[in-house]
Amino acid sequence: MAINLEDKKAIVAEVNEAAKVALSAVVVDARGVTVGAMTGLRKEAREAGVYVRVVRNTLLKRAVAGTSYEVLNDAFTGPTLIAFSNEHPGAAARLFKEFAKGQDKFEIKAASFEGKFLAANEIDVLASLPTRDEAIAKLMSVIQGATSKLARTLAAIRDQKEAAAA
């Protein structure tokens, strides 16, 4: 299906705006995925704050030009679906990693985070980044553990002094 020039410009502008505000990007080959599964993926992506779009490779190369996602240009081959994480850097990678478990033909090509190219086998690093809430919970447990250890130490010192005085 041919796209007129105005539509192409609009697509490039839309994807470029998404790329400018995104924290990370993941490129996949979604060939062979059913329409129902793709609809479900798009719904999950919206809920996770991930912008998902199927774009022609030439338009995609123009859209990411001048952004930190230019490093992905070599991955723009064949049918390409791109996802930009807007709220958490690992959101798109985590979403696609989970989705790929149930889809044989869904292939993660590459990702980019902070201007660095990540090959398909390095996606796990991005997907395993804790969310903001998870990071806060881990920090609080570390602080709580240190606080309780300090309290136990002070109590032991007090008990020793009381025993020595008695």
Curated annotation (Swiss-Prot):
Record-level GO BP terms: translation
GO cellular component terms given for this protein: large ribosomal subunit
Superkingdom assignment: Bacteria
Any coiled-coil regions, as ranges: none
InterPro entries per the UniProt record, alphabetical: Ribosomal_uL10 (IPR001790), Ribosomal_uL10-like_sf (IPR043141), Ribosomal_uL10_bac (IPR022973), Ribosomal_uL10_bac_type (IPR047865), Ribosomal_uL10_CS_bac (IPR002363)
Subunit structure, as described in the record: Part of the ribosomal stalk of the 50S ribosomal subunit. The N-terminus interacts with L11 and the large rRNA to form the base of the stalk. The C-terminus forms an elongated spine to which L12 dimers bind in a sequential fashion forming a multimeric L10(L12)X complex.
Official protein name in the record: Large ribosomal subunit protein uL10
Organism of provenance: Pseudomonas fluorescens (strain Pf0-1)
